[in-house]
Every structure is written in C-alpha cells, then in structure tokens.
Curated annotation (Swiss-Prot):
Name listed for the protein in its UniProt record: G-protein coupled receptor 22
UniProt subcellular location: Cell membrane
GO MF assignments: G protein-coupled receptor activity
InterPro entries: GPCR_Rhodpsn (IPR000276), GPCR_Rhodpsn_7TM (IPR017452)
Residues exposed to the Cytoplasmic side: 1-45, 107-115, 178-208, 336-348
Membrane topology of this protein: Multi-pass membrane protein
BP GO annotations: cell projection organization; cellular response to hormone stimulus; G protein-coupled receptor signaling pathway
Entries under Gene3D superfamilies matching the protein: Rhodopsin 7-helix transmembrane proteins
Length: 432
C-alpha cells in the first residue's frame, strides 16, 4: 500500500515526458530549416530557369534547321557540332531541373538518392561537354591545317561520337558505383553517405566517394591545353598562308602596275601615231586592268577580314569555355584537397550555374556564326515572311512591293560591249 502513490507519480512523470517529446518532434517537423537561404534559392533558380529557356530554345532551333537542310548534315563538322547541341538539350532537360530540385529541398529529408542522381548528372555534363569541345577543336584543326588530307572522315567521326557517348555514360555511373548502389547487399547501406549536398550530418570525407571529381578535373585541364595548342596552330597556319599570299599578291600588283604604266605609255605613243582605234583599244585595256586591280583589292580585304574573324572566334571559344568551367574545376580540386564543407558546396552550386551557361553560348559560337547556317536561317525567314504576306492579302487587290522580298533587288546589271565602249568614250568626246 505504501508504493502505490509512488508508482502513480512515476507513471504520470513518464507520460508527461513522452508527451513533451512528441510535441517537440511535431514542432521540429513543422518548422524544418531550409538547406539554403531564400535569396540564394530565388536567385539561382531564376538563373537556372533562364538557362533552360534560352538554351533549350536555341539548341532546338539549330537542330531543327540542321535536320531540315540535308546538305548541312552531310559534312563531318556539322555532325560533330550537332552532337554538342544534342548534349546541351539533354543538359537543359535533365541536369538543370535536378539542380533546381536540390536547391529547393530541405535539410531533414532523406535526399541521398536525389543527391546521388544530381552528382551523376553533374559528372555527365562536365565530362561530355569537355570531350565534345575537344572533338570540335580537333575538327577545326583538321579543316584549317590539313584541308586536303583530312583525318576525320565520316566513319571515324561516327566512331568518335560513339566513344564520346560511351565514356559520358560511364561518367554518369561513377557516383552510383562510389556509394555501392549496384551491390547485392541491403539497399540501406549507402543512404547515409551524402554526396556534396548540404546536410545536418557530417560529410563523408573518404576519397572513394569523390572518384567522379578525379575524372572531371584531368579531362577539363587536358581539353584546355589541347584547345590552346590547336587554336594557336590554326592561327599560325592562317597567318603563313595569308602572309605568303599577300607577298605574292604584292609582287603581282607591282608587276601589274609596271604593265599598266607600259601599256599607258604605249597607248599614248600609239594614240599620237595612230587614230581613234588605238585610243579605244587603250581605254579598253586600262578598264580591264582596273577591274582586275579592284578584284585583287577585294580579295585582299576578304582575307584580312577572314583572318580577323577566325582570331576573334578562337578567342571567344577559348575564353567562354574557360570562364564557364574553370571555377567549378578549381573548386573540385579544392574539395579533393581540403574536404567538403557547407561553404564549398554552396559555392559549387553557384559555379555550376556558370558552367550550365555553355548551353546558351554553344549555339552562338558554333552554329549561328557559320555562313552556311546563316544562309539557311535567312532563307527560312524569308520564306516565312513571304507565306505570311501571301496568307494575308491587302484589300482591293493592293500590291505590296517589299524590297526585302523582291527578287529584282539581287538581280545583277549586265552591260553589252557596245554600251561599255560608249560609256568609256563619252568623257573623251566631251573633253575634245
């Protein structure tokens, strides 16, 4: 009888403790902390959505125009470039949305599987982008330095692209191999190993968890070195050719000037001795020589413009790749040396947004700057405008004369021999 009140008190205290624990658990579940600050989430999500819209729209436009025009697909260079645009579409559809999901997740949830998929997508995007840019660099070198004896034939290009996709798929599987995802053991054995995601628990700091970083870093630096060497050789080859052509062109111009002076001197002598026929002959030869000189000057200017254009495009391609992928590669090296932390993981997400910017720059650098692609795009736009004008006719049978659509604008004006002779002789008759 003495122990009954004591037992009742103990039971009441235990019940109170359990009730308080349940209340605390409910409170913590109701107010879960976010993994990142709200401003950080909003800004990065906005940039990622912009990259999805612009990158997906521009890359799909390029692919549709390439597929609509059969002569664009026939070349090796365009096929290799199309491979890069297909990769950018995959990144816009699969990798960038998963990064947005990682940004918006909370800390307390079990996000091991999503983090693993995100790391796999980042590894895939990094490795495949570097390899595709490397392939395009080799193709540019092959065209510029060895145009007659090309190494990249159609069969070799297909083999190269197949090997690129196989290696990219293997880089996608590396994060799953690191966490023993495909092992026959229990499925919960790998869930506690978070992969570079901000978490309340400590990071898994063993080197075996970051083999995918060890793959990304050497491939990036190797691609950068190859790009620098290759584009310098391309510029050297163009300078040598243009320089030799300019020197020979200058010699030819000097010879032509001598011949012009001789012909003019001869024509003056002949004009003094003979009559009007020799005057007409001298004028005709001088006009032909002037036309030849104008053509030579035009070719000289075109070569100079081509040299400047190639130099600018080479600088833009190299600087864009370095600007987008160098920060995240350097940060991956820092993570391998110092280990992961919350600050480094947040910086990595910021640099990943910069790296995804190549999905916007690749169509601008590799497709819209090509003259053949520009011609196809202009022709499609003209046909579209013509179809719109024909679909909506003006009332009262009014005719619209559009100088952009009118084919007479591009019509070349030709003169007969008699007209040229009359135009050349008119000033002489007036002066006489």
């Amino acid at each position: 009888m003495c122990f009954s009140p004591v037992l009742e008190i103990n039971m009441q205290s235990e019940s109170n403790v359990t009730v308080r624990d349940d209340i605390e658990d409910i409170d913590t579940n109701m107010y879960q902390p976010l993994s990142y600050p709200l401003s950080f989430q909003v800004s990065l999500t906005g940039f990622l959505m912009l990259e999805i819209v612009l990158g997906l729209g521009s890359n799909l436009t390029v692919l549709v125009l390439y597929c609509m025009k059969s002569n664009l697909i026939s070349s090796v260079s365009n096929i290799i470039t199309m491979n890069l645009h297909v990769l950018d579409v995959i990144i816009c559809v699969g990798c960038i949305p998963l990064t947005i999901v990682i940004l918006l997740l909370s800390l307390e949830r079990n996000t091991a599987l999503i983090c693993c998929f995100h790391e796999a997508c980042v590894s895939f995007a990094s490795v495949s982008t570097a390899i595709n840019v490397f392939a395009i660099t080799l193709d540019r070198y092959d065209i510029s330095v060895k145009p007659a004896n090309r190494i990249l034939t159609m069969g070799r290009a297909v083999m190269l692209m197949t090997s690129i996709w196989i290696f990219s798929f293997f880089s996608f599987l590396i994060p799953f191999i690191e966490v023993n995802f495909f092992s026959l053991q229990s499925g919960n054995a790998w869930e506690n190993k978070t992969l570079l995601c901000v978490s309340t628990s400590e990071y898994y700091t063993e080197l075996g968890m970051y083999y995918h970083l060890l793959v990304q870093i050497p491939i990036f630096f190797f691609t950068v070195i190859v790009m620098l060497i290759t584009y310098t050789k391309i510029l050297q080859a163009l300078n040598i050719r243009i320089g030799t052509r300019f020197s020979t062109g200058q010699k030819k111009k000097a010879r032509k000037k001598k011949t012009i002076s001789l012909t003019t001197h001869e024509t003056t002598d002949m004009s003094q001795s003979s009559g009007g026929r020799n005057v007409v002959f001298g004028v005709r030869t001088s006009v032909s020589v002037i036309i030849a000189l104008r053509r030579a000057v035009k070719r000289h200017r075109e070569r100079r413009e081509r040299q400047k254009r190639v130099f600018k495009m080479s600088l833009l391609i190299i600087s864009t790749f370095l600007l987008c992928w160098t920060p995240i590669s350097v940060l991956n090296t820092t993570i391998l040396c110092l280990g992961p932390s919350d600050l480094l993981v947040k910086l990595r997400l910021c640099f990943l947004v910069m790296a995804y910017g190549t999905t916007i720059f690749h169509p601008l650098l590799y497709a819209f700057t090509r003259q053949k692609f520009q011609k196809v795009l202009k022709s499609k736009m003209k046909k579209r405008v013509v179809s719109i004008v024909e679909a909506d006719p003006m009332p009262n049978n009014a005719v619209i004369h559009n100088s952009w659509i009118d084919p007479k604008r591009n019509k070349k004006v030709t003169y007969e021999d008699s007209e040229i002779r009359e135009k050349c002789l008119v000033p002489q008759v007036v002066t006489d």
